[in-house]
Structures are given as structure tokens and as C-alpha cells.
Amino acid sequence: MIKPNDFKKNTLCNCNCIQSDQIYTDPNVYPSTPTHEHRISHFLNYRFFKHQSASFPSCRSLKVDDLRKKKLQNSYINRNEKCLHWFTIGH
């Protein structure tokens, strides 16, 4: 199982959008945004993600409600009730 410490703080798990060349890995990689809400909504424009590491399965589509329910920060994203991806959203 993935544990929080597997990822550095203020990074998104190395997910790469299947529909885009843009990689959301680190706050320094993609344009910084002033708020969680803004960054998350920008992030969610791309619905399907593929983890770059072979040890992780593909990410499922992310839902805004799921993130809000888990308070946006330090959120577990559930994939088919089996795979958990650790997300910490940078300030």
C-alpha cells in the first residue's frame, strides 16, 4: 500500500496526463496558482492520468467532489477501492 511518506510534501504523485504533454509532478514544474481551488480545477481539466512508475497502476478519473470531501490537501484518491494515490497539494 502507498504511504504518505512515499511522496515528498507539496507534490502530486508522478501522474502524467494521457491527453496532454503537460506533466503535473511538482509545483515548480507547472505554473503556480494562488489557491488550492484554482490549482485543483486546473489539474482536473485533464480527466485521466497514467502513473509514470511501472509499480503503480493508472489513475482513474478524478472528481472535484472527491477532492473537496477529502479537504483538497493530504488527500487519498481512491482507485476502484483498491489503489490509493497520495496527493499533497502545494500552497
From Swiss-Prot:
Name used for this protein in its record: Uncharacterized protein KLLA0E17732g
Source species of the chain: Kluyveromyces lactis (strain ATCC 8585 / CBS 2359 / DSM 70799 / NBRC 1267 / NRRL Y-1140 / WM37) (Yeast)
Highest rank taxon of the organism: Eukaryota
